[in-house]
């Protein structure tokens, strides 16, 4: 039997007693769950010691003089020590990862004499995992070593004397664990050691409320780096945010990390701390997305807590489309100051807004028309035969025109202001009313049209007077056209009787005839269509019959021939006079094989009527233009001068209507009759147009002096000057929008059969909203002061730079030639009002165009827009796009702005920019300095040299950004240099055989 020698236990016990006075106990961290704490047990621990003579349990005191149980061992005199100490079975609960905290003291072996070969300063920590208590037997081979524990500090005999306390604390972790519990074991191999305390615990994240979500107690994961995701539960009266459920992650250290998502208080509740409290009375919250409760809007209330919306007060309403936060509103009061103006069977109504709009901004107006019998005092709705301009309901403006009323009838009109809650109100309607009696109306439809006689080249017709002439019929108008040519043109004939013979028809052709009557009140509706086929060409038998007749009565034949010859001569003279008379330009130049009164497109399109067809020009003016009282016009200032007189700005105030800003063209004093006719001719043309992109004619003054034409006022003036004034200030989309408006106006004119002939940016006017409108409908005046602006040919002056080649050479003006001019306008707009072809002479322009050269793309012009310009400049007019197609192309560009970012050079087919004799041959220059001197930009020579542009080849590759990077800040100089670079690049391509003419 080996007797083990140990140092006296009082040495260690004394040290432990000293520790009790020096050590302050640590409070248990809230995230730790204790499984074992030896300090908390005041009775004997009764752990298993093997051998029994090894570890021994002793008592001590803590800082509060509370007894604590410790184990010590100090068998340092003998070698090969193997002393085991095992705890009782420890249940792990829900833990997967366990922490063991050891507090111990250890004697310095050097302070003990005679033990250098046997004394150790470490011990081993083990554990054994099991589902139940296995008894008191320690089976060492089943234990798994956790670690070898060494002291950071060991104590000596001197430390005891000096009361120096050296307590070591070590923490080790175990896991992951899979069984219900485990044992801890401590192996001494020859150290002098005392286990002051053993604490076993695991960590978990304690329950918290975060973002209005409750997260329960959660045990940490099995690995040090693991995060356990936990889904929260919303507190009372809260709900999960859409597609953003509340989640948090429990870390291995027992801390909540990475909050994701949240809960939000339901409608009617707001957050207060970690709870949702109901909205108070007179408050509401309509959506869980709102943060706080809001006070009820005006004229609404809530009489309970937790309201999600407020109810409207009596007499107030909320429209279905109104959000809950807007005030309750009511229907508007009646419109004010209702006035009317009667023009035969048309009534214009105008009024002022209601004094009370009910608190809403969506006030519109609706009109109720009643036809009344004064004798019986009864009124009935007018029915669907009445027309309203612009509409009967949903009116945003405070005026309306009611048309197609019966003549000499009594009507009552009620004008009601309505808003979004008018239909919800049960109150009586509020409206303004006016009663009127109509005057004379246009005649009703002509009836009973019959063909009396049909020959090869003539047709005789007869008809009955209208059932309701509504006045004295002064003439009838017969409209006729070839049935298979109805898409092109028609002709008219006027007569004062109820029969007529229409001559100069084609044999064997079907014609369509319609007739309408005219009174002082205007034209009535056309009669139903009557189709008549002329006879075929005469056969041989008819010639024989004619010969026999001539033999029988030669005197009659001679007389007939003489009369016929006289009539033909008269018609030739008359036709010559008509052909020579013109309004701004000769209609003989208009394309077509016949001299026709009208050019008309079917179906349903309003037709342009040439004022030349009127024997009396005054009649054309009064048919298409409203005669104004000069007293209604106030001239304020002169804004320009034209060929016929001054152009002024002023105001037009018609009775019962608002005054509007207008532009006034005046006819100068001492005018000739021809000048007066030409002056009013433009009004006769403008009066036929009604389109938002065509300048609107307000009326004319012909019965006083000065003679005036009054048109709408366009605040920004001519487009070319406007663009030059605002150079570089618009986006590409804005410029394309302007071009789209011009194209829409030209499409309207083309559909009416009107050819403009002088489409240019100077003849486009711009209003305050940047709406562009086509103007200038007379070509008789000088186009510009510059004599080079026009090229004189037989028959008049032509604006060469804007005119199609066939119009210059053959005077063939068509909608296709207007398309060419529109392409030039596009170039003007994209270049901010630059002069087309710059300083080239007109002869050089004509020559360059004939050779196939076209204007290059302006700076920063998208390739798609330049391609459209080139399409408009096709030599063959049939290959040019129609205005309808141009509008469609521009609409697509506006709907797809990315298409306007296409860089130049990506066109569908190669092009060659303008090259002509007046353009310098940039390829002949030897240096960049010579080139700059040629374009008068030599001041920037040093800029180019400093940036490394020493060859023309490198210059030809420059972009606008490169030019700007040289410090060239003047926009005009940037444009001039870039234009020259583009031309240089084109010449280089042309020199190498890659340039292709259009």
From Swiss-Prot:
A cellular component annotation (GO) from this entry: Schaffer collateral - CA1 synapse
Residues passing through the membrane, by range: 556-576
Catalytic function, reaction form: L-tyrosyl-[protein] + ATP = O-phospho-L-tyrosyl-[protein] + ADP + H(+)
Protein kinase domain sequence ranges: 633-894
Motif (PDZ-binding): 996-998
Compartments where found: Cell membrane
Residue positions the entry lists as glycosylated: 343, 410
Phosphotyrosine: residues bearing it: 608, 614, 791, 940
Keywords: Apoptosis, ATP-binding, Cell membrane, Developmental protein, Glycoprotein, Kinase, Membrane, Neurogenesis, Nucleotide-binding, Phosphoprotein, Receptor, Repeat, Signal, Transferase, Transmembrane, Transmembrane helix, Tyrosine-protein kinase
Molecular function GO labels: ATP binding; axon guidance receptor activity; chemorepellent activity; ephrin receptor binding; GPI-linked ephrin receptor activity; growth factor binding; protein tyrosine kinase activity; transmembrane-ephrin receptor activity
One GO BP annotation of this record: negative chemotaxis
CDD domains in alphabetical order: EphR_LBD_A7, FN3, PTKc_EphR_A, SAM_EPH-A7
Tissue spec. comment: Restricted to the nervous system.
Membrane topology, record value: Single-pass type I membrane protein
Domain (SAM) ranges: 923-987
Name of the top EC class for this enzyme: transferase
Domain Fibronectin type-III: 331-441, 442-537
Binding locations of ATP: 639-647, 665
Keyword Metal-binding attributed: no
Signal peptide: 1-27
Documented EC number(s): 2.7.10.1
PROSITE patterns assigned: EGF_2 (PS01186), EPH_LBD (PS51550), FN3 (PS50853), PROTEIN_KINASE_ATP (PS00107), PROTEIN_KINASE_DOM (PS50011), PROTEIN_KINASE_TYR (PS00109), RECEPTOR_TYR_KIN_V_1 (PS00790), RECEPTOR_TYR_KIN_V_2 (PS00791)
Binding partners and assembly: Heterotetramer upon binding of the ligand. The heterotetramer is composed of an ephrin dimer and a receptor dimer. Oligomerization is probably required to induce biological responses. Interacts (via PDZ-binding motif) with GRIP1 and PICK1 (via PDZ domain).
Described function: Receptor tyrosine kinase which binds promiscuously GPI-anchored ephrin-A family ligands residing on adjacent cells, leading to contact-dependent bidirectional signaling into neighboring cells. The signaling pathway downstream of the receptor is referred to as forward signaling while the signaling pathway downstream of the ephrin ligand is referred to as reverse signaling. Among GPI-anchored ephrin-A ligands, EFNA5 is a cognate/functional ligand for EPHA7 and their interaction regulates brain development modulating cell-cell adhesion and repulsion.
Protein name: Ephrin type-A receptor 7
